[in-house]
């Protein structure tokens, strides 16, 4: 199944654009619980309300030698009809990039990955060549320092363009398999709206809701296409740690349902 088709089916199956981040933080998890146990309960509790999960590889790498095993087992827990996105932000050249692609797609079996365009097309090609997998290219990110480079103006095709605009245009040029999307932060509403109008057929992975302060209503209005689709709206801490202690899973389920329903409320305009 092509990635874009699975993305649409995942959203339709649970009537959801919500993508929950699986970022297990030992400081916030229930005392004595392993990351794998935590993820298992989170997935079981939230799966009815989401279109997929975004797995931030850094949280597993930080767990040491057992981290990869926990990561691998976590990926297996995700229901097959839902998306699994490896938030890896990879970007390297040659055999290194090929190895990264094999690790994410062949070993972990993820449906998609986040990647950095800074090294150019040859650093992304090994991912793009997995024609049934999705590649979300960092474009206009949600962090405070993102403007350091992304808002620089450069000469492009005879015009002065922001660097993030060049990234978006290049991403479209590379999208011959229709498996490329953009990472656009919910904290960047002006650019989110502009990019959606310019690229109505590309999926957007949209972090920055919740702890980073992104506005949910504006994100739905600016980040979805004319059919109210093609957006994966990400939330992590606000879902995972909605409650503490033994009620964490129930709290996550309630928070996920509430956010899914809020997103759908704002989608009613479509």
From Swiss-Prot:
Active site: 89 (proton donor)
Gene3D superfamilies on file: Aldolase class I
One of the Pfam families matching this protein, by short name: OMPdecase
InterPro entries: Aldolase_TIM, OMPdecase_type-2, OMPdeCOase_dom, RibuloseP-bd_barrel
Pathway the protein acts in: Pyrimidine metabolism; UMP biosynthesis via de novo pathway; UMP from orotate: step 2/2
Keyword set includes Lyase: yes
Signal peptide range in chain numbering: none
Keywords attached to this entry: Decarboxylase, Lyase, Pyrimidine biosynthesis
Enzyme class: lyase
Gene Ontology molecular function terms on file: orotidine-5'-phosphate decarboxylase activity
Keyword Ion transport: no
Catalytic activity: orotidine 5'-phosphate + H(+) = UMP + CO2
Family in the record: Belongs to the OMP decarboxylase family. Type 2 subfamily.
HAMAP family in the record: OMPdecase_type2
Xref: PANTHER family: OROTIDINE 5'-PHOSPHATE DECARBOXYLASE
Stated name of the protein: Orotidine 5'-phosphate decarboxylase
Provenance organism: Dehalococcoides mccartyi (strain ATCC BAA-2266 / KCTC 15142 / 195) (Dehalococcoides ethenogenes (strain 195))
Gene transcribed to yield this protein: pyrF
């Amino acid at each position: 199944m092509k990635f874009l088709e699975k993305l649409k089916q995942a959203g339709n199956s649970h009537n959801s654009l919500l993508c929950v981040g699986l970022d297990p933080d030992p400081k916030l998890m229930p005392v004595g619980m392993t990351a794998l146990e935590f993820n298992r309960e989170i997935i079981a509790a939230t799966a009815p309300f989401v279109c997929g999960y975004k797995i931030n590889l850094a949280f597993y790498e930080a767990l040491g030698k057992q981290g990869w095993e926990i990561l691998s087992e976590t990926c297996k827990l995700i229901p097959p009809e839902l998306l699994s996105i490896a938030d890896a932000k990879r970007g390297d050249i040659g055999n290194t990039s090929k190895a990264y692609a094999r690790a994410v797609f062949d070993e972990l079996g993820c449906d998609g990955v986040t990647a950095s365009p800074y090294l150019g097309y040859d650093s992304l090609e090994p991912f793009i060549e997995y024609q049934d997998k999705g590649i979300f290219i960092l474009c206009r990110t949600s962090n405070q320092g993102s403007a350091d480079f992304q808002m620089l103006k450069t000469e492009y095709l005879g015009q002065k363009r922001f660097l993030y605009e060049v990234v978006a245009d290049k991403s479209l040029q590379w999208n011959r398999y229709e498996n490329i999307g953009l990472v656009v932060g919910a904290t960047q509403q002006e650019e989110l709206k502009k990019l959606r109008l310019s690229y109505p057929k590309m999926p957007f992975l949209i972090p920055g809701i919740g702890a980073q302060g992104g506005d949910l209503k504006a994100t739905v209005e600016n980040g979805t296409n004319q059919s109210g689709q093609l957006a994966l709206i990400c939330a992590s801490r606000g879902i995972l740690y909605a409650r503490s202690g033994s009620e964490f899973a129930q709290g996550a389920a309630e928070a996920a349902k509430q956010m899914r329903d809020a997103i759908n409320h704002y989608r009613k305009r479509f």
